[in-house]
From Swiss-Prot:
Keywords: Cleavage on pair of basic residues, Disulfide bond, Glycoprotein, Growth factor, Secreted, Signal
Subcellular localization: Secreted
GO molecular function: growth factor activity; nerve growth factor receptor binding
PROSITE patterns cross-referenced by the UniProt entry: NGF_1, NGF_2
GO cellular component: axon; dendrite; extracellular space; synaptic vesicle
BP GO annotations: cell surface receptor protein tyrosine kinase signaling pathway; modulation of chemical synaptic transmission; negative regulation of neuron apoptotic process; nerve development; nerve growth factor signaling pathway; neuron projection morphogenesis
Signal peptide: 1-4
Protein name: Neurotrophic factor BDNF precursor form
Residue positions with a glycan: 106
Coiled-coil portions: none
């Protein structure tokens, strides 16, 4: 069950023209990467990537949430404010997915890499696609009270305006979306892949022209 945070102006922090709403960070590149990274001599790009990911996850565990950011877990990594279309999935989204995978696997890094589903030829039950969607494409959404609100395309910031982007995941129009879930015996069971939604925080306007940050529903999984 999700608990709504108080409706207050969300902080925007980041570098350049790419930021996450409500993202709070601690430390800098030196403290996150560690003093001995340059001399460790990792042998491959895969090892380097895994090493950086693990250090970021370790740093995240060290940071203890204070009373001021007790609602930080309600902020979604699927919302981004940017002057242009993001070229990659959100970093926090990748970290969360990777952390969930590590927790589930609970094995050494090298064993995890060789047991990756892609290496074993495993397929998901339902095929899905993910992409960045603009507020102009969404136009409207449903908030936590069930009311339809207008999703604002641009968010004012000290140096101008940034566009709102949403990283949505939905069932693929091809494959097993209509034929049923992969791996289910169709002779005995009926199944269907459906797109499910979650709440993210976005700048919106209600039917009374009141602008504010609200939790709205977007497509997040299949």
């Amino acid at each position: 069950c999700m608990k709504a945070a108080p409706m207050k102006e969300v902080s925007v922090r980041g570098q350049g023209s790419l930021v996450y709403p409500g993202l709070r960070t601690q430390g800098n590149l030196e403290t996150l990467s560690g003093p001995n990274d340059a001399t460790r001599g990792l042998t491959s790009l895969a090892d380097t990537f895994e090493h950086v990911i693990e250090e970021l996850l370790d740093e995240q565990q060290v940071i203890q949430p204070s009373k001021e950011n007790k609602d930080a877990d309600l902020y979604s990594s699927r919302v981004m404010l940017s002057s242009q279309v993001p070229l990659e999935p959100p970093l926090l989204f990748l970290l969360e997915e990777y952390k969930n995978y590590l927790d589930a696997a609970n094995m050494s890094m090298r064993v995890r890499r060789h047991s990756d589903p892609a290496r074993r030829g495993e397929l998901s039950v339902c095929d899905s696609t993910s992409e960045w969607v603009t507020a102009a494409e969404k136009k409207t959404a449903v908030d936590m009270s069930g009311a339809t609100v207008t999703v604002l395309e641009k968010v004012p910031v000290p140096k101008g305006q940034l566009k709102q982007y949403f990283y949505e995941t939905k069932c693929s129009s091809k494959g097993y979306a209509k034929e049923g879930c992969r791996g289910i015996d169709k002779r005995y069971w009926n199944s269907q892949c459906r797109t499910t939604q979650s709440y993210v925080r976005a700048l919106t306007m209600d039917n009374k022209k009141r602008v504010g940050w609200r939790f709205i529903r977007i497509d997040t999984s299949c």
